Amino acid sequence: MPRVWDVPVHDSTRVRDVRVAAEQAAALAGLDEGRTATAALVATELATNLLKHAGGGRVLIDVVAPPVLAGGRDGARLVQVTAVDHGPGIADVPAALGDGFTTARSLGAGLGTCARLSDHFDLHSAPGRGTVVAARIGAVPDGPAAEPGPADRVRAGGVNLPFGGAQYSGDAWAWVRAGDLVTLMLADGLGHGPEAARASTTAVEALRDAAHVTPADALRRLDRALTGTRGAAVAVAQVDTRAGVLRFAGVGNIGARLCEGGTWRHLVSRPGIIGTHRPTTLREETADWADDRVLVLHSDGLPSRWTPTSETCSTTADPAVTAAVTLRDASSPARPVRDDTAVAVLAPVPADRP
């Protein structure tokens, strides 16, 4: 079961904990000494910023797949460092991203360095609401990039917050690619703790062999794979990038919202539990997929009062940032989440990016 690190940062002793967590995640991702040092530096800078400029916050560290699965190669793993706060926000984001920028009034110190050293870097900041920063650090590429195709114009990202600071989350998300098909899955193992994590991890492993089948067929395969576990609520969304079609099927209490040009639509899962009580009939929903679409999947750890905003429908933000902003704004320091919570987002690659 993969580790997930949730480090609250409210005093200087936790900065070291963040650095150690980044180093441990880098070892799991198979990074070499140089990239491990980079991950540790980025994590340390972001944690230090939380203390000095945001009054504290939390750092989530996970090992994730790349945001774009080039040529179907989904074996690469990156360290994802996400800093989340409810602080004053950044008044001038472009200035904050300059190397050496610092101010005691808003977050900013070291962000330019973090952006330059990371493989992927993005942030969202709103005055009075706080800042979310997501950075990914992976291995040095060992060959030329594959020729782009339709599937390279879709990207995914997410965050995973374990309940009560546990080492393992009972929630998991993953995505895979087979040709022009890209498939995003979110699983919520029954309950929380190691056994819930085992169920959701089993779903992730089984998904790798189901990249070429429909969401309904993927759920049937996952149901067989999860036999003998606690079971899990699972939602599977698949985009046929050449046809421009989204297909969705879910079982259990996984939230699914599709933004279509600024209008939100619910995608409905059927009652049941994959691995123990799968419904006999699995219905798929379909929708058009275009460059103005954003899909959000979330476990029931997200409060039911959460409603998407226009920011959630951003097609330019990194999906991991969208997921983290969703998680932050659906809770608060006074009302923390009460269960493992995962949010995963599927979005187009902006047209102005390679």
What is the role of each PLM region?
Residues 1-13, 20, 29, 74, ...:
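Conserved subregion of the PPM/PP2C metallophosphatase catalytic domain
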Residues 113, 198-202:
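Short amphipathic alpha-helical face segments that pack within enzyme cores
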Residues 1-5, 47-147, 178-184, 239-241, ...:
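Conserved beta-strand-loop-beta-strand hairpin that lines the nucleotide-binding pocket
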Residues 16, 20-44, 103:
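Conserved short strand/loop->alpha-helix "switch" segment adjacent to the catalytic nucleotide/phosphoryl-transfer site
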Residues 39-54, 195:
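Histidine-centered phosphotransfer motif of kinases
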